Amino acid sequence: MLIIPAIDLKDGACVRLRQGRMEDSTVFSDDPVSMAAKWVEGGCRRLHLVDLNGAFEGQPVNGEVVTAIAKRYPNLPIQIGGGIRSLETIEHYVKAGVSYVIIGTKAVKQPEFVAEACKAFPGKVIVGLDAKDGFVATDGWAEVSSVQVIDLAKRFEADGVSAIVYTDIAKDGMMQGCNVPFTKALAEATRIPVIASGGIHNLGDIKALLDAKAPGIIGAITGRAIYEGTLDVAEAQAFCDNYQG
């Protein structure tokens, strides 16, 4: 399982939100490229970037920062989400050296767009499903739909999606542990690999994901925990690599 540091971008700075609320943000660095360097030097094997302004505006806003990080680390897999709602945007990021684009809101509102994107950019598309009580949320989590996460995930199985990033909104940024039972249920219900996100606080939460014994869970995204020092990236990755269960 991969430990994937998150860099959330707002107005060019690296921030963390609590439960997706833009007004409840903490600035951790005004130099996201240096922050990326810190996690790379700490041994991370993939980075998770989110354009928070983009998620709310429906188009990239912090694209220059993303490009700068991708250029600095051409051999590091980078995934970017937030405001990706057109093939042009995907093409822009792929040309900039980004490995994966995460389609969120558009995947819920227009599921056929995912198939289109996978066809145009095979192996590059991840679907981001953010949920509250098992139902999918969209538009920077401002709206909760009547669509169930597992039902929607199954729709994408035939499209060639590389992974699903599953985030439990109630847990995100709260450092109270991630929703292991639902993450496991999602991983077992679909053939698409799942990346867990939201709520990871310490090594115990990483162990809980591994103890779930769901081979489909291939990664865990962590944000606030690594910024506030309750989780060490290198230690957590070593723990995953050596886990015997």
Curated annotation (Swiss-Prot):
Its main location: cytoplasm. It catalyses: 1-(5-phospho-beta-D-ribosyl)-5-[(5-phospho-beta-D-ribosylamino)methylideneamino]imidazole-4-carboxamide = 5-[(5-phospho-1-deoxy-D-ribulos-1-ylimino)methylamino]-1-(5-phospho-beta-D-ribosyl)imidazole-4-carboxamide. It is an enzyme of class 5 (isomerase). It comes from the Bacteria. One of its GO terms (cellular component) is cytoplasm. Keywords: Amino-acid biosynthesis, Cytoplasm, Histidine biosynthesis, Isomerase. One of its GO terms (biological process) is L-histidine biosynthetic process. Pathway: Amino-acid biosynthesis; L-histidine biosynthesis; L-histidine from 5-phospho-alpha-D-ribose 1-diphosphate: step 4/9. GO terms for molecular function: 1-(5-phosphoribosyl)-5-[(5-phosphoribosylamino)methylideneamino]imidazole-4-carboxamide isomerase activity. The active site is at D8, D130. Pfam families: His_biosynth (PF00977). It is found in: Cytoplasm. Its EC number is 5.3.1.16. Belongs to the HisA/HisF family. HAMAP family: HisA. This is 1-(5-phosphoribosyl)-5-[(5-phosphoribosylamino)methylideneamino] imidazole-4-carboxamide isomerase.
